[in-house]
């Protein structure tokens, strides 16, 4: 299903979502992470704060809806952003790591995987990762399909 087709289907249930679609895929393991969201095991994500300013992109907003894509740019589900915060990487909580639903869901696993990704993405953009680097933490709930 294309993002537009899924958006149109959900709009019949929730007309207040409007016409503007924000569709995206996770930065790594696109299919696995999209499937975790679809199954309700992944209800949070994190991204490197420095990349938002560099790309002139605004931070995610609570109450908005996003279409989650797979590696083929097909719509997997729609989520509503329920919480957005910014904090240093080294202050991300075990609770947030668990909500991300990846690996063994531990903070140690989360830090290992995300430090590697953030360091690489920031380096590619000419920025440096440190344990104090800010990260954008998002929490969401799957709203479609139910």
Protein language model regions, located:
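Mixed-charge, low-complexity intrinsically disordered regions
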Residues: 1-78, 84-146
